[in-house]
Amino acid sequence: MDTVSIAEFLYTNADLLNQEQFDSWLEQCSNDFSYRITTFSEELGRPMDWMDKDKSGLAHYLQNANNHERYTGRLRRHLAMPRVTKQADSSFEVRTAVAIYVIEMNGETALYGIGSYVDNVMSESSGLRLTSRVVTLDTRRLQFGPHVPI
């Protein structure tokens, strides 16, 4: 598997999130997929986990997202510099820089957060699958909590 194919997979994955096509996004994830959002608190001197879900928990979370009060804008994820940092057989660890913007309904755009994705990607006969994603945010003060995967 070449790095260009892995990068294209991750770009498509981000585009599905940008379009809020969550069912299609989840289809790209393995059955044992795990998702975590974390950051380091300078004040506490330790990491903080803001979200930690498996695939079924995330699916339930997304099914109910519109039943709760949500921000009115949409998030747009911009990925940069995906690098394969580890490889074992058909499994790849990929670190990617990410900038997340929020586009309000009136057209205003603001930076939501920056950080990195550490993805584990598995090559299967049916194609690539995301087996885990850890979002490590450098930004620690968000305008609003993440109602959808960032």
From Swiss-Prot:
- Which GO terms label this protein's molecular function in UniProt? 2-aminobenzenesulfonate 2,3-dioxygenase activity
The name this protein carries in UniProt is 2-aminobenzenesulfonate 2,3-dioxygenase subunit beta
Key words of the record: Dioxygenase, NAD, Oxidoreductase, Plasmid
Annotated transmembrane regions: none
Q: Which cysteines are joined by disulfide bonds?
A: none
pH dependence, entry free text = Optimum pH is 7.5.
Tell me what controls its activity: Inhibited by o-phenanthroline.
